Amino acid sequence: MLVEPQADDFKSAKQAPANPHWYKGAVFYEVLVRAFTDSNGDGTGDLRGLASRLDYIEWLGVDCLWLPPFYASPLRDGGYDISDFRAVLPEFGTVEDFVYLLDEAHRRGIRVITDLVLNHTSDSHPWFQQSRSDPDGPYGDYYVWSDDDSRYADARIIFVDTETSNWTYDPVRGQFYWHRFFAHQPDLNYENPDVQEAMLDVLRFWLDLGIDGFRLDAVPYLFEQEGTNCENLPRTHEFLKRCRKVVDDEYPGRVLLAEANQWPSDVVEYFGDPATGGDECHMAFHFPLMPRIFMAVRRESRFPISEILAQTPKIPDGCQWGIFLRNHDELTLEMVSDEERDYMYAEYAKDPRMKANIGIRRRLAPLLENDRNQLELFTALLLSLPGSPVLYYGDEIGMGDNIWLGDRDAVRTPMQWTPDRNAGFSGCDPGRIYLPVIMDPVYGYQAINVEAQRDSASSLLNWTRRMIEVRKQHHAFAEGDFVELGGSNPSVLAYKRTWIRPDGRLDIVLCVNNLSRFPQPVELDLSEHHGYTPLELTGGVQFPDIGELPYLLTLPGHGFYWFQLLDADAKARRGE
């Protein structure tokens, strides 16, 4: 058997403050370690470089960092092809550097989660090398092997651009191995109890070091069963319950976030039993919502958003959705109809180079043609719709992309800190940087960077920071009930978020969003709140009191309002 490092071999980080439901009110920020800051001049971002930028992340208002894989890897799939679950990729640093990052983050009240790729490993992982060379050895059954490639024929191929089958022949073992993703990423065999125990030990290793949780990558595909599509199988949920029990019993306060690109009715199963408040994952991404936000604004109609939220089941009390606009992958269009996918390609990916797999490899600002009003509207929706928002590094300053780079590298370029050499990312020769910094006239680092925007009160960065600050002042955004209000104008999306405070008082937030590029009026039935006063949250301006008649608002093109609805007692407490 292989000898694995243990957490006791390393110093562990200080724990974050105890708060079992911290994730419900958190603002998440996805950072690619490679892309954030290079501390040693080798052209690649690293853990020490990321630690040096924690003051900025704290200033922005971020509660939790999400780090995609930083493990040892041959890097054929951006680190999702892991060759050692207990080692850090040398160019990123060491396990000790990761513990230092955790310590520094926790000292600032920032939590850290990372991806754990449960479904597969790299084909260079020692487990796979042992499995292929010694079928009767201890690792012989760690992967899914077959004498032919006819099994599980109903399972779809995910990477249709590059893969023609989910089976690949291995000449060393003389059998086919199963892979739901790339051929160099063989799937682990979760029918083998030893595999389950090995992955639970990986979970414990990083939790012992102090990490605050995991985004569980590609969870729907852990098990296979003939005659099914090999997704969302009951055995998968059984294993996730085991993971959750380990967390609850041994590491309370840590979080499991499911990455399941499925319909809401399927994803809700990953929260587990509602009677227990949820006994699988604490959080899950709401993938189908994201493309429908883009569709709704381009069609100037609230119905794409309204319909998907209406199809979203209630989730257990202890759980929360994760919502996002962009991340390190393509803007995935798996969870839309063929007609909707064609529409999205026509509107947002006019150049064929902008497409990747079943999606669009562009950043937020270029998708929205660098329109400040749209950027603000999209961010306001992200921060106010049900769920914990996940920002993608650089979107807070409106960073661009580079569609001339291969695959998803288009949206993974270095963070733009200053207008200086290499955008302040690295002091190395520009030719050594892992990817070139953006240098075009609109999105280039000379024009778009943190330094310039921090000094400008009206910048997108300072506006985003202010909106995060406002969100945190009203817990209704985090845990409030969501009620869509309809209204007289289909171009306007209006909803209430209502939260009952511990003292029994209500925190009611009204959000009104104009999805049209033109000014729009709307009449809302707010008679339930007759006598209440809407207080606009970004400027503190009071609007006319609500009466029994429909409440009339006029919004500028792509404009929005956030109001707190104040009753007589609330106004009295404000001294009015």
Task: Enumerate the language-model features and the residues they cover.
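Active-site and adjacent substrate-binding regions of carbohydrate-active enzymes
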Residues: 1-576
